[in-house]
């Protein structure tokens, strides 16, 4: 039957089948069979489309729980931080405050990039300092007698009482450790374990910077050098190598430069109780050997230039020429750390 568009309308599959059956077997034509076949193909295609739509919907549904879970976790973390910060605002005990600050810092660092963690970590150090000071002040009587509690009357080390062990355990749980200051004095500081926990989550360039800072802490005690001359030279070399390994971080150069200059001066003139000369004013053999090694191992180093000139001096009884030599190189060298120092007014 012609349609309005001039095309022949296809009968439905059922109608086509009825027509085909109504004809004598000799008259059941190919056209009717073709129409029936086309409709069956059409139905099969529609079923396939519906199947694909169903599977797509199922896949989308399966993705939603993960997204929802992530959103829920983020909201829960934010809620926990808010709750902890409210508790912090009401806490007065420095130990409680330090514990809360650690929990807040841990939660904040979970949801940000390594670069953003640097700011969070440094903020923690700043705000934790006050509470560490508060704990030291509160426990001053105990800390003043810390070593006394661990020695007998003859000065021999003994096992501390269980109550003292429990007290030290509480310090450990807070992220604190006892640090010897010399001459029997001690104080509580943030523990190395705590630093390791946070530093491991930061970018490599910051981790290296941090280790340089820690390694140059307390390199002198009671006027004595706590490192060997070679260890001191190695620390200087590591500072200088940092600028080559991480050239794109001049902001770190600005942080390292002052300490680096102090190391150079220490390397050349020694300390009150770790001198570079013997009683007669002659350069100590171990110092001369170390300077020679450094100049050969790091020929392009500004420190190598200093020691090369220092080795030419005839006398070391007066340290002023050495100090002037160090100052001269520091004012003229193009090494990034010394350039950074001059930019800050260091020279």
Residue ranges of each PLM-predicted region?
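Short, Lys/Arg-enriched N-terminal segments with co-localized hydrophobic residues
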Residues: 32-45
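Sec-dependent signal peptide recognition
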Residues: 47-53
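Acidic, polar-rich low-complexity tracts and alpha-helical solenoid repeat scaffolds
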Residues: 69-347
